[in-house]
Amino acid sequence: MVQENKNFATAQAKSIRVSSRKLNLVAAFIRNMKVSEALVQLTFSPKRIAKVVKDCLQSAVANAENNLGLDIDRLVVTKATVGKALVMKRVMPRAKGRATRINKFFSNLYITVTEKEDN
């Protein structure tokens, strides 16, 4: 069995307290972007969840640098995948003895950064 030279690193953030639709807005924004540019965009993004995405991206960059020895100046965000996690169900009392269910959604985030060759 031949071992391939790995040129990508991953990081994940699980059970983030935000809906997957809102998280995917930020994740889709940084897909196929250089890591340095993505970090700047996430720093100044008005979205609340951008801070969590930035932390996960910084973790992926640290994994690439420390575990694989990749050059951080040539890293590109190749995958930013969002998945649904658990749903916390709550009950809100309403008028006339009724009750309404409130769903609080959680999401998972997976980020992959790859070292691109200079062309």
UniProtKB/Swiss-Prot annotation:
<keyword id="KW-0699">rRNA-binding</keyword>
<dbReference type="GO" id="GO:0006412">
    <property type="term" value="P:translation"/>
</dbReference>
<comment type="function">
    <text>The globular domain of the protein is located near the polypeptide exit tunnel on the outside of the subunit, while an extended beta-hairpin is found that lines the wall of the exit tunnel in the center of the 70S ribosome.</text>
</comment>
<comment type="similarity">
    <text>Belongs to the universal ribosomal protein uL22 family.</text>
</comment>
<dbReference type="GO" id="GO:0022625">
    <property type="term" value="C:cytosolic large ribosomal subunit"/>
</dbReference>
<dbReference type="InterPro" id="IPR047867">
    <property type="entry name" value="Ribosomal_uL22_bac/org-type"/>
</dbReference>
<comment type="subunit">
    <text>Part of the 50S ribosomal subunit.</text>
</comment>
<dbReference type="InterPro" id="IPR001063">
    <property type="entry name" value="Ribosomal_uL22"/>
</dbReference>
<keyword id="KW-0694">RNA-binding</keyword>
<dbReference type="GO" id="GO:0019843">
    <property type="term" value="F:rRNA binding"/>
</dbReference>
<keyword id="KW-0689">Ribosomal protein</keyword>
<protein>
    <recommendedName>
        <fullName>Large ribosomal subunit protein uL22</fullName>
    </recommendedName>
</protein>
<dbReference type="InterPro" id="IPR036394">
    <property type="entry name" value="Ribosomal_uL22_sf"/>
</dbReference>
<dbReference type="Pfam" id="PF00237">
    <property type="entry name" value="Ribosomal_L22"/>
</dbReference>
<keyword id="KW-0687">Ribonucleoprotein</keyword>
<dbReference type="InterPro" id="IPR005727">
    <property type="entry name" value="Ribosomal_uL22_bac/chlpt-type"/>
</dbReference>
<dbReference type="GO" id="GO:0003735">
    <property type="term" value="F:structural constituent of ribosome"/>
</dbReference>
<comment type="function">
    <text>This protein binds specifically to 23S rRNA; its binding is stimulated by other ribosomal proteins, e.g. L4, L17, and L20. It is important during the early stages of 50S assembly. It makes multiple contacts with different domains of the 23S rRNA in the assembled 50S subunit and ribosome.</text>
</comment>
<dbReference type="InterPro" id="IPR018260">
    <property type="entry name" value="Ribosomal_uL22_CS"/>
</dbReference>
